[in-house]
Amino acid sequence: MAAHSYHFVTRWRVRGTVEEVGQIIGDADSLAAWWPSVYLDVSELAPGDEHGVGKVIELHTKGWLPYTLRWRFRVSEVRPPGHIRLEAEGDFVGRGIWTLAQDGPWTDLTYDWQIHAEKPLLRRLSWLLKPIFAANHHWAMARGEESLDLELARRRAATPAERDVIAPPPGPSTMPAGPLLGLAAGIALIVLAIRRRGASR
């Protein structure tokens, strides 16, 4: 696998039906509302058919690290209520597959995300900082599970008073760039020192 290639399999478990959860996951236009820690801006470029196949969404996203990503996806396959496949391009190039399965009162979600990072920062530094970039993805997905659980609770609330007591979803990270740059410089120095020691033997 190339240094800038990534393959993540994320599993969530939330209380609700596949139909409830699938309605939220399949509504890309609402991502910035219920998952604002990651989705800063979402724009629909093409509507797709009655199931959403062919829909094209443009995204501006981030994780806890101090950089943002601009990319888009096209929904290439939908099998209601529990399967959505999308194709990504831009700062990410690859594909993602959502699979939902009912388990009693719970829905188990699996997101299989296989991409190449094409943003210059990620492409050039993945050989060095891949574990940190991977941790950034895991942080984003953990916020997603938390935010989905809150969104399900909001949608079930019977009155405005019930809705008001539900916590808002977590917002974007405000981590400054300094720590990341310092960490990258430190790792680079360690790698260079190891290489020089190996070359001198």
Language-model segments: which ranges?
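Signature tryptophan residues that serve as conserved aromatic anchors
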Residues: W34-W35, W98, W113
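Well-ordered beta-strand positions
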Residues: R13, S76-E77, A101
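Intrinsically disordered, low-complexity regions enriched in Ser/Pro/Gly/Gln/His and often acidic
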Residues: S5, G26-A28, W64, D91, ...
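Hydrophobic ligand-binding cavity/cleft-lining segments
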Residues: M1-E50, L192-R201
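Terminal "cap-and-tail" regions of soluble proteins that handle hydrophobic small molecules
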Residues: A2-H4, V14, D103-R201
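Flexible, glycine-rich phosphate/dinucleotide-binding loops
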Residues: L31, I84, E118
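A short, polar/proline- and glycine-enriched secondary-structure boundary/capping micro-motif
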Residues: L69, R95-T99, K119-L125
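Glycine-rich portal/gate segments that line the openings of hydrophobic small-molecule binding cavities
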Residues: E19, S43-R95, P105-D108, R143-A158, ...
